[in-house]
Amino acid sequence: MSQSSPSNAETDEDLSTTSSSSSFVPIEQHQIQDAIQVIDENKEFNKNILPYVVKTTPISSVGNNYHIISVFGSQSTGKSTLLNRLFNTNFDVMDESRRQQTTKGIWMAHSPQVSTTKQMDTHQENIFVMDVEGTDGRERGEDQDFERKAALFALATSEILIVNIWETQIGLYQGANMGLLKTVFEVNLTLFGKSKLEKNDHKVLLLIVIRDHVGLTPKENLSSTITQDLLKIWESLNKPAELAHLQFEDFFDTDFHTLRHKVLQPKEFLEDVNELGDRLVVKKDLFRPNYHHNIPIDGWTMYAENCWQQIDSNKDLDLPTQQILVAKFKCDEISASVYEEFHQKFKAISSANTPGISTLDYQDLGLLLVDLRSDTLENYDLSASRYTKSVYEQRKDLLKEKLNEKFREFFDAHIKHLSEKSVKEFETNIVGLKGKNFDKEATRLTRETTDYFINSAILLSLENELDYDVHVSNLQDQLTKLIQQQQLVELKNIVNKSIKKLSSGLTKAVSFELADPTETSWNNILSKFKEFVLDFLSKNELEEEAGTYDFGLGTNRAQNKEAVETFKFKSWNAFYEIIHKIISKDNLLTLLKDRFDDKFRYDENGLPRMYQNTVELETNFGISKSFALRIVPLLTIAKLNDNSEILPDYDIFDSKLRAKYLGLVENEHDSEDEEDEEDRCFAEIISESEKAEVLNKFKKETDARFIETKRSIVQHVTQIPYYIYLVIMVLGWNEFMAIVRNPLFFSLVLVFGAGLYILYSMNLLKPAMVVVQRLIDEIIAMAKEKMREFLIDDHPTQAHNLQKISASNREKVEEEKVVETIEMQDL
C-alpha cells in the first residue's frame, strides 16, 4: 500500500497490498502498518518477520512486554473484519459481492491501538495480531492439511487464540470445527505436551467470540455447551502414556464474548467490539502472565519458525481419509480388547512372581513373559490384519509399546531388586579386600557381579526387546563408585598407619636425643624423621618411573600424588606435635631440675654430696645451675648444628592446607586468631614468654634448695662447738683408757665406731639417731607401765593399761614407719 516504507524493501514485498480503508476506527493513517505474511499458502515461513517487528516498534523498548493474539475459525465468518475493528489493523477483508477466500496463509500485523469504549493509550502494550486462513474453504476442498497445521501453529505460538464462531454453529461438530480442534489438540499434546511437565503453569486462552448473537439463548448457556464439547474432545484424545494424567484445564483457559449482528445492528456491534477491547487493555484480565512464553520478541520470531518447522515436518499431521479413520477405529478397538485380556494374565503372573522371592527362577519367568507377549500380538494380528496395512502396523507398534511399557514396569521392579542385591553383596565383598591385591580382586568382583546381573537381565528382557543397558550402566556406576570410595578409604588407612608408625618411632628418637641434648641432637632427630619419610616413599615408588607412586589400589596418579602429599604434610605436622608434646613448659622445667640435681646433689662418681662449708656449696651451686641452663637454647628452638632452624616442606599452620590434608575446618574462633597463627614458627618450641616463665620457676626452686642446704650446714656448725670435743677428751680420759685396755670394750667401740662411720658416710646418721631415740622412748614407756602394774594391783586398771600400751605401740610403730619412709625419701 502507499504507506509502505521504501527503506525496507525486503519486507515490503511480503506486505498486504489492501487499502487501509478497511480500518473502521478513526485513527491517524500514518500509524497503521501493513500486515506481513508469516506463512504463505505454500507452507513457506517468512524470514523477514524480525525486520518487520523492528520497523513497527523498537525491540530494545519491547523486550518481554508484548502479546501475541491469533484468530481461528471458518472461512468468510468475519475474522479479519473483527481484527481490523478491534486492533485497528488493515488485514484484507472479503468483498461481500463475491463470497470467496480472502486470507491465504497466516498474516501478522502490529496493533497501533485497541478499540475501547473510552479513549485509552495502548501503544505500550505492543500487541501483534495473527490472521489465520479460514477453515472449510472451497478453495482447498478436502485438503485440510494446511488448515490443521495453521491452527496448530497459532495455538503453539499465541497467548490468546480467538475462536470466531457464529451462534448458529454452536452444537455442530464439523460446522464448529470440533473435528479440526480435536486433531489439533491431539497433535499439540503430542508435540508440546512434554514441555508441560517442566513448565506446569503455562496455558493458552481460548477466547470464544460468538458472532451474530441474537440474545434468545443466554451467553452462559452457549458457553456451557461449547465447554462441554471441548471437554468431550479432550477426553477422546489418544494421549501418550506419560501425559495421560493431564487435563484440559492444564493446557487451556476459556473465556467467552458475544458480538451482535454487524449488518443488522452495526452500532451495537461496535459497542460489543469496544467492550472486548476494554478487557484486553485491563491488566491481568485476558492477558495473564502464565500465557506469555517468557522470551523477548526477537526470540519469539525464532521460536515461531522452529515451531512451524516441527509442525510441518510431522507426518502425523496429514489429514486421514475416511478409510483410514475406520481402520484406526477398528484397530484401536481390537488393540484395546487384546490388551485387556493380556492385562488379566499379566496381573496373575505379577502377583505370583514378586521381586525378592528366594525361589524365583529368572529363566522360567522370562519364557513365561515371552509367551504372553507373543500370544497377545498373535491375537491382534488375527483380527486387525484385514484393515489398512499402514494403520494396522502403526497400531501394532503402539500396542507393542503399550505391552512393553507394562512389561517395563515389571522388568524395572525385578531389575531394581537385582541391582540392589548385587550392589549390597559387592559392597560387603569389597570392604573385605585388603593389601596389595585390592585392585586385582576389585576387578574380579566387578566382572563377576556385572556378568551375573547381565545374564539375569537378558532372561527377563523379552529376548532383548527391553533395553537393559541403562540398568547395566547404572550398576557399573554404583560399583565403580563403591570401588572408588573403598580405594580412598584404603589409601587413607595406608597413610594413617604410616603416620602412626612414624609418630611412634620419632617419639622414641626425640625422647632419646633430648634426654641428654647436644649440639647435634636436632640433626639426629631430623635425620631420623627423613629416614621414616623416605622409607614410606621408597616402598610405594615405581622402580621404572621415579617420582611416581602406586599403592596397589588402582587409584590414579592424581590420587596417589595427593596421598603422598597428605603423608608428607601429616608427617611434618606429627613432627611438630611430638616435639611440642615432649618439650612442654612443665617437661622443660622438670628436665632442668633433674640436670641441676644430678650436678648439685651427686658428685662425678654418682655419690651423694655432703657440703662442709658454704664456699663449696656456692661454687657447686653455680656450676650445677650453669649445667642445667646449658640445654635451654637447645630445647626452646629446633636448630641444627650449623645454627639454621628446621624448616618444614609445608606451611603446617596454613588453614587451607590444614583443611585440605587434615580435614580441619576453621571456625570463628580460629579466624579471630588468624593473625597470631601467621606469626607462629615451626622451629620455635618454647616462646620467649614461656621461656621466661620456666626460668623464673627454675630459679625459685633452685634458690630454695640452695638456702635449705646452706641452712643445714650452718645448723651443723652452730650445734657442736669445737671446745666440747676438748672437754669430753679431758673428762673422759680415764674411761677412754679403761675401754682401750679392755679388749671387749675395745672391740665394741671399734664395731660401733665403724657403724657410725658407715652411717655418716651414707648420710644415714640422722635417720639412725631418730630410730634409736624412738627405741629408747619406747623402752622407757614400757618400763613405766611395768612398774605401775607392779605397784598397783588393780586388774581392771591393768587391763585398761595393757590396751592403751598395745594401742600406743601400734601408733608409734606406724609413726616410725612414716618417719622412716620420709627419711628414706629425703635420702
Curated annotation (Swiss-Prot):
Q: Where is the GB1/RHD3-type G domain?
A: 63-291
Coiled-coil portions: 389-409, 472-492, 803-823
Leading EC class = hydrolase
Lumenal topology ranges: 741-743
Which keywords does the record carry?
Answer: Coiled coil, Endoplasmic reticulum, GTP-binding, Hydrolase, Membrane, Nucleotide-binding, Transmembrane, Transmembrane helix
Task: List cellular component terms (GO).
Answer: cortical endoplasmic reticulum; endoplasmic reticulum membrane
Matching entries from PROSITE patterns are given as: G_GB1_RHD3
Q: Where are the transmembrane segments?
A: 720-740, 744-764
Q: How does it sit in the membrane?
A: Multi-pass membrane protein
Q: Where in the cell is it found?
A: Endoplasmic reticulum membrane
Q: Which processes are annotated in GO (biological process)?
A: endoplasmic reticulum inheritance; endoplasmic reticulum membrane fusion
- The EC number of this protein is 3.6.5.-
Name the family the entry cites.
Answer: Belongs to the TRAFAC class dynamin-like GTPase superfamily. GB1/RHD3 GTPase family. RHD3 subfamily.
What HAMAP family does this protein's entry cite?
Sey1
**Role description:** Cooperates with the reticulon proteins and tubule-shaping DP1 family proteins to generate and maintain the structure of the tubular endoplasmic reticulum network. Has GTPase activity, which is required for its function in ER organization.
- What is the protein name stated in its UniProt record? Protein SEY1
